[in-house]
A protein has these predicted regions:
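Regulatory cytosolic signal-relay segments
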Residues: 1-48
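Catalytic NTP-binding/metal-coordinating core of nucleotidyl cyclase/transferase enzymes
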Residues: 39-121
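Catalytic core regions of nucleotide second-messenger enzymes
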Residues: 92-99, 130-145
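Short amphipathic alpha-helical surface micro-motifs
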Residues: 33-37, 86-89, 132-135
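Short low-complexity stretches enriched in small and charged residues
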Residues: 5-14, 29-32, 59-64, 79, ...
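Serine endopeptidase catalytic core focused on the charge-relay Asp
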Residues: 126
Length: 145
């Protein structure tokens, strides 16, 4: 969710909102074949959808600061992040991509088994990309990711 900074926080309203959500009918949730449009998602409704998520990050990235300075680290992170995003973004079933630090995650709309199989192929492409990137990093005497 993108921040819009258009409202101030009110603790009393927040408490009421929590009560509204927790006391809502269990019938306020419906099954959907695909992920609903963002405009259809509110804090007052809910959907059951079949999705698959991929999370990929740089293991031990905090230790990389011991070996490399900022320009090198920035290049390593950018190469990793940009290619992860590119691979996921190439898939029509990928509906959401987020970057959190050195983690990239994508949410894929997977109503059918064949869609899940496709996400496994995406994971395989990500793995192959990491192997290529590590080869390139070794050639520059950088740490592998």
């Amino acid at each position: 969710m993108e921040s819009n900074n258009t409202m101030s926080y009110d603790g009393d309203k927040s408490s009421d909102s929590m009560d509204d959500i927790l006391n809502a009918s269990d019938n306020d949730y419906c099954d959907k074949d695909s992920i609903p449009a963002r405009s259809d998602l509110t804090f007052k409704n809910g959907y059951y959808v079949n999705v698959t998520a991929i999370f990929i990050d740089i293991v031990g990235s905090s230790d990389m600061t011991d070996e490399h300075k900022r320009p090198t680290l920035a290049k390593m992170y950018r190469a990793f992040l940009s290619e992860c995003v590119a691979i996921m973004n190439a898939e029509i079933d990928c509906k959401e991509i987020n970057i959190n630090g050195d983690c990239v995650w994508g949410v894929f709309d997977t109503p059918y088994k064949s869609d899940i199989d496709n996400v496994i192929s995406v994971a395989a492409r990500l793995n192959s990309m990491i192997k290529i990137l590590n080869y390139k990093l070794r050639k520059k005497n950088y740490s592998e990711i």
